[in-house]
Amino acid sequence: LTAYVPQDGVAGGKKRTYPLINEKQTVLSSIGTIDFRHILAAKNEMENWRFLRFNPEHLRQPTSKYTGADKLTPSGLNLAAVLYRIKQEDEYSLIEISRELNRFIPEFTGVDVIDDVEHNQYVIYLQQRDGKIFSSRVLSEGTLRLLALCIIEYDNKVKGIICYEEPENGIHPFRI
């Protein structure tokens, strides 16, 4: 078995041959030149695909300021730091994130993140319609997952396709 990859736009141009028996990597991963620009473009696009598998324990955690990380990991680590960065860039985004979450969970009317200077961490808080405030540490798995997806929507560092298996996981059936 062999794969043949012709050069883009050139009749009789370069052609690469890839034997597929006992191959350890994909053909796509081995192409890195402009001679195959369409394949290179597809490869570059696919490198921006993000596969998320949120771990509720990671979503609950405040983000330590010592890590310096403000990019969401596939498991959900750094969610508070991501929200803090978004708040610093455009505080109005918190209102938009709050509205988006409220569309799915009407009980919650506000989303905020604080800089807990005493503990050197960022902590997420949600406010209910009755004024009660809850830390991310006590929120349900479904609420945390929906909150993370709402935050991702307003994160300008997220590019490409988001792949998220079973988005309804942990969400009450009446919310779907």
Protein language model features and the residues they cover:
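Electropositive, glycine-dotted interaction segments
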Residues: L1-I95
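Broad structural signal for hydrophobic residues in well-ordered alpha-helices, predominantly aliphatic
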Residues: A42, L101-N102
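Switch/communication elements of ASCE P-loop NTPase nucleotide-binding domains
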Residues: E100, E107-I176
